[in-house]
């Protein structure tokens, strides 16, 4: 089509001029040359191997040169998400799109997703993650190859269960502190995400980073807000064609704002690392645990597909183990000449874990509170479970043993993560051609494959009544009958979230403390939610709740 248009343009230009080509005006010559170049490029693109290989994959209508890149022009993050979901509903579980010459293939079938996530063939993160490079460097989220494998191996043990148990009192202290701060909002509607965001930053600083004295004033909230703004900027760069080009982006006001946000973010983490190195006393921070026999592992079954190195570390340790939390472990490794670890590695991983460990759980906890505010019957069941655990002393500190009894609260958290996964998609670059399991499609090497957790979690063939908030979706008997890649809020396989157990424990302690202190109300319904996915799934119109103080009888 594009070739025919150019031919017609050339014929019109030739017939309207009695001069030779040498007589064309410079403007006309430039126009004709540009059109010819564009036509040749489009002809080459449509005859390329990758274009022909994916010709049978459904897609929205595309424009020459641009593909579907024009679709995002002028739209907000919430509008982009809505349009994208609309296309997926129309074109089915597998869809392709072109951002210029960049091929994207979207997957929502668990059998296809298993091919991407379960093995070691397609571990390379997509090109779209390069916009995180100034922030995360070569941290776990975006690194590849030997560097990623080495860092994963060294960092995973810092999230061992014995370390997590030691964090519970700190989780409790910060949960009680945010309960007190939120008391000032009691009786009125407010955005709870602001409180969750600051609290999760403080918890990370006090636990994984080992900070003794938290930043004064609103520094934690300032950092959290800078992270939100930086995610918005990176998302714009990923979906807006012109912002993808460094040569254009560097001259924009968006880049100026990004520089300001990065100064705030790196200023905080640099200070954290500097403080920890200056005050590092390894023996006072170490946890020594004697394990005589390994923890009994789950019998091999199809659920084995979702196991990862975190399970192996927890279950197979024997003997005396000396453990350090994340930043302390990295400081010690950097001092050891026999370990491949340096100062840049420390900064890269601190920036990565600070982002992954706070923004995701602040969104998850905020969504959970909103859902309990909307579904009062479910909140009542959560409270009843808390009553059964805490008895007549409902305001005592939570323990690790208590969290193990919170089966219904855990199901509420999992159901929240099903409907509103904080990370709504995963992007990988194929290292080999891939034949999909769900249909007659072969995706070529080099393609950016996007796994859409948000859509997988709402498939009606997997979750009957998929938009209903139903914690019983995570009863063991229901889970046993589902494909094990049909629920992947923490990803799965070798590149699963290294902090998933940390996140679940933190969410249990935080939500338990809030629910035991307050009745959560919401004037919004799920129909009022305006979802936006700027890296992390959030609500454009805020996580609005109100709180009512619970009253307990005092013992005379």
Curated annotation (Swiss-Prot):
GO terms for biological process: cuticle hydrocarbon biosynthetic process. May be involved in the metabolism of insect hormones and in the breakdown of synthetic insecticides. The keyword Coiled coil does not apply. Its cofactor is heme. Its main location: endoplasmic reticulum. Heme binds at residues 356, 497. PROSITE patterns: CYTOCHROME_P450. It comes from the Eukaryota. Pfam families: p450. This is Cytochrome P450 4g1. SUPFAM superfamilies: Cytochrome P450. Disulfide bonds: none annotated. It comes from Drosophila melanogaster. GO terms for cellular component: endoplasmic reticulum membrane. It is found in: Endoplasmic reticulum membrane; Microsome membrane. The gene is Cyp4g1. Its EC number is 1.14.-.-. CDD domains: CYP4. Belongs to the cytochrome P450 family. The lineage of its organism: Eukaryota, Metazoa, Ecdysozoa, Arthropoda, Hexapoda. Signal peptide: none annotated. GO terms for molecular function: heme binding; iron ion binding; long-chain fatty aldehyde oxidative decarbonylase activity; monooxygenase activity; oxidoreductase activity, acting on paired donors, with incorporation or reduction of molecular oxygen. Keywords: Endoplasmic reticulum, Heme, Iron, Membrane, Metal-binding, Microsome, Monooxygenase, Oxidoreductase. It is a peripheral membrane protein. InterPro entries: Cyt_P450, Cyt_P450_CS, Cyt_P450_E_grp-I, Cyt_P450_sf, Cytochrome_P450_Monoox.
């Amino acid at each position: 089509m594009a070739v025919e248009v150019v031919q017609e343009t050339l014929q019109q230009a030739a017939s309207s001029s009695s001069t030779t080509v040498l007589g064309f005006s410079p403007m006309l010559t430039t126009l004709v040359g540009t059109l010819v170049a564009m036509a040749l490029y489009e002809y080459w693109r449509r005859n390329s191997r990758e274009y022909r290989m994916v010709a049978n994959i459904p897609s929205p209508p595309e424009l020459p040169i641009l593909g579907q890149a024009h679709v995002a022009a002028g739209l907000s993050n919430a509008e982009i998400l809505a349009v994208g979901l609309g296309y997926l509903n129309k074109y089915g579980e597998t869809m392709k799109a072109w951002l210029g010459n960049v091929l994207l293939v979207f997957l929502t079938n668990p059998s296809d997703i298993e091919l991407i996530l379960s093995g070691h063939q397609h571990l390379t993160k997509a090109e779209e993650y390069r916009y995180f490079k100034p922030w995360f460097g070569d941290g776990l989220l975006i690194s590849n190859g030997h560097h990623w494998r080495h860092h994963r191996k060294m960092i995973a043990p810092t999230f061992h269960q014995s370390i997590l148990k030691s964090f519970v009192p700190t989780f409790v202290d910060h949960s009680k502190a945010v309960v007190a701060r939120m008391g000032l909002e009691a009786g009125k509607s407010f955005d709870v995400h602001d409180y969750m965001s600051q609290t999760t930053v403080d918890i990370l600083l006090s636990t994984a980073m080992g900070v003794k004295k938290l930043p004064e004033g609103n520094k934690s909230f300032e950092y959290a807000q800078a992270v939100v703004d930086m995610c918005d900027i990176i998302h714009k760069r990923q979906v807006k064609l012109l912002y993808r080009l460094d040569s254009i982006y560097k001259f924009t006001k968006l880049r100026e704002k990004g520089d300001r946000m990065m100064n705030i973010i790196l200023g905080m983490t640099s200070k954290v690392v500097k403080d920890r190195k200056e005050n590092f006393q390894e023996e006072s921070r170490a946890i020594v645990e004697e394990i005589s026999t390994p923890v009994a592992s789950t019998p091999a079954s199809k659920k084995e597909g979702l196991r990862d190195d975190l399970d192996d570390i927890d279950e197979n340790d024997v003997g005396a183990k000396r453990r350090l939390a994340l930043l302390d472990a990295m400081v010690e490794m950097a001092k050891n000449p026999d370990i491949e670890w340096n100062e840049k590695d420390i900064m890269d991983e601190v920036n990565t874990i600070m982002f992954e460990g706070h923004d995701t759980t602040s969104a998850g906890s905020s969504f959970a509170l909103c859902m309990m505010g909307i579904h009062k019957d479910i909140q009542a069941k959560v409270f009843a479970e808390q009553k059964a655990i805490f008895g007549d002393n409902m305001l005592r500190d939570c323990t690790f043993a208590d969290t193990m009894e919170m089966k219904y609260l855990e199901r509420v958290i999992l159901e929240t993560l099903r409907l509103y996964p904080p990370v709504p998609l995963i992007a990988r670059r194929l290292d080999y051609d891939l034949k999909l399991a769900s249909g007659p499609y072969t995706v070529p090497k080099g393609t950016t494959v996007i796994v859409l957790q948000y859509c997988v979690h709402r498939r009606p063939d997997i979750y009957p009544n998929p938009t209903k908030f139903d914690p019983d979706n995570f009863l063991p008997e229901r889970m046993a009958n589902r494909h094990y890649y049909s629920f992947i809020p923490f990803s799965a396989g070798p590149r699963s979230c290294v902090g998933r157990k940390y996140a679940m424990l933190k969410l249990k302690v935080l939500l338990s403390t809030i629910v035991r202190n307050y009745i959560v109300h919401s004037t919004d319904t799920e129909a009022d939610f305006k979802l936006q996915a700027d890296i992390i799934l959030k609500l454009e119109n805020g996580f609005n709740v109100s709180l009512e103080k619970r009253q307990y009888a005092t013992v005379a």
